[in-house]
């Protein structure tokens, strides 16, 4: 009896460690933006400000988490021939839900993000995790994978949005940091997105290398 209890505790600890590893992989080791370089369209297109980056990241996180859970639950019932269309239907359902919620409760952010919200449906991060992970793993593992990837994506977009807003307008989350007449318009425009992203990727990889 005692041995069985110890074995169960050991299994629980191992499962928890595995789930935490999956979670942190998405945030750091396999960060979708800074490491895998996925989702570049919303990354470059929505990060003109910190609030836009945060909003887009959280919307994508909700879709990632929800889609991973549902697809993992249904993986044994979806025929292999139609799995991609089925995944897209599941993802599109949650994207529509996010779109309706944002339109109702944060209309200014909804208007600012515009077409990028429905484009979450074809975001390669969301569909990629559904195909590569959720369709092959348990619900709990898929949940942690979706959460980790979503948080990693949110972190990247918020950092990029903050950097661009700070350098472009002297503000972060609309709070004045630098003098009022400060601002480099380049960083609010598309070329500034590429420059800021390149520097953040370099810094992120340098920190990872130093840690290793």
Please provide the spans of the model-predicted regions.
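Structural signature of hydrophobic alpha-helical transmembrane segments
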Residues: 50-66, 86, 110-121, 191
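Transmembrane alpha-helix boundary signature
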Residues: 97-112
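Intrinsically disordered, low-complexity non-transmembrane regions of multi-pass membrane transporters
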Residues: 2-24, 208-212
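A glycine-rich, hydrophobic loop/mini-helix early in the fold
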Residues: 60, 64-101
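C-terminal ends of transmembrane helices
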Residues: 67-80, 127-137, 203-207
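Cytoplasmic-side transmembrane-helix entry/capping segments in multi-pass membrane proteins
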Residues: 78-91, 112-118, 142-145
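Hydrophobic core segments of alpha-helical transmembrane domains in multi-pass membrane transport
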Residues: 38-44, 60-61, 65, 92-99, ...
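C-terminal transmembrane helix-loop-helix hairpin of multi-pass membrane proteins
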Residues: 21, 143-212
């Amino acid at each position: 009896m005692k041995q069985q209890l110890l074995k169960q505790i050991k299994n629980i600890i191992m499962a928890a460690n595995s789930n935490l590893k999956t979670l942190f992989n998405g945030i750091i080791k396999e960060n979708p933006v800074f490491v895998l370089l996925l989702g570049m369209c919303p990354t470059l297109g929505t990060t003109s400000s910190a609030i836009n980056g945060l909003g887009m990241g959280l919307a994508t996180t909700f879709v990632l988490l929800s889609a991973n859970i549902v697809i993992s639950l249904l993986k044994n019932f979806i025929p292999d021939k139609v799995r991609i269309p089925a995944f897209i239907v599941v993802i599109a359902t949650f994207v529509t839900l996010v779109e309706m919620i944002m339109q109702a409760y944060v209309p200014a952010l909804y208007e600012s993000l515009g077409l990028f919200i429905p484009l979450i449906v074809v975001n390669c991060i969301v569909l990629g995790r559904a195909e590569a992970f959720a369709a092959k793993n348990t619900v709990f593992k898929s949940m942690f994978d979706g959460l980790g990837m979503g948080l990693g994506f949110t972190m990247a977009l918020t950092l990029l949005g903050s950097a661009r807003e700070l350098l472009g307008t002297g503000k972060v989350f609309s709070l004045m940091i630098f003098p009022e007449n400060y601002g480099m318009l380049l960083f609010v425009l598309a070329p500034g997105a590429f420059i800021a992203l390149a520097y953040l990727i370099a810094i992120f990889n340098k920190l990872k290398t130093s840690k290793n």
